[in-house]
Every structure is written in structure tokens, then in C-alpha cells.
Curated annotation (Swiss-Prot):
It comes from the Bacteria. It holds the Pfam family Asp23. InterPro entries: Asp23 (IPR005531). Belongs to the asp23 family. This is Uncharacterized protein Spy1535.
Amino acid sequence: MTTEYIGEIVISPRVLEVITGIATTQVEGVHSLHNKKMADSFNKASLGKGVYLQTEEDGSVTADIYVYLQYGVKVPTVSMNIQKTVKSAVYDMAEVPISAVNIHVEGIVAEKTPKPDLKSLFDEDFLDD
């Protein structure tokens, strides 16, 4: 079976960022993402709150994710779960390989602190019910 070329598919970095952010917040033990302003000198796209993406020459993507975790969780375990979940979600949904997922734990949040609404993390209309 041959595949006929019928055009190009371009996936916006914003889409990858939203996939990464949602996948991260769904990992058990993650309280929320953290918006960290980063200097553009690192050549990273700061497109949203807590998720920073950099496209490599080979087309793969490196993700830096800044998170707050819930009190009482095992930080290394939650961090590895974030890495696995993000790599899988981005590849499954966009077929974009993630070469590295760097987790930056910005803090631990007390159990009774309410989680932020997902709509406050991303300005996307499709998150409205």
C-alpha cells in the first residue's frame, strides 16, 4: 500500500503546550502548573503557564514543566509519572517525539489548598463546557 502525498500537516506549538499541560495536571500528585518567566536567550517558547517547549534540529521537542505537587507525595515518583504521561500523550495525539521532559518542582502545596480551574491555565474556548 502506498501513501499518496496530499499536503502538509502543521501542528502549532500551542497545541503541544496544551496537550502537555493537560497531561501534566492529570497525573496523580500534581497540584498545578507554575508560570515561570524564562529568558528568551534559552531559545524556548514561553507560550503558556508552566510549560516551555523547545524544538530541536531533528524535529523532536524538549519540554520544561514547572509544577506544584501535593503534600505527602513521593516527588521522584510523581516526576517520573509526569515524564511518561507527557511523552505518551504528545506522541499519541500529535505524533511528535519528546526527547526530554524536564520537571521543575516549584513547591509543595498543603492538602486543603483548592486546585486551580483548568480554564485558568489556558485561554482556550474548547475547555468551556
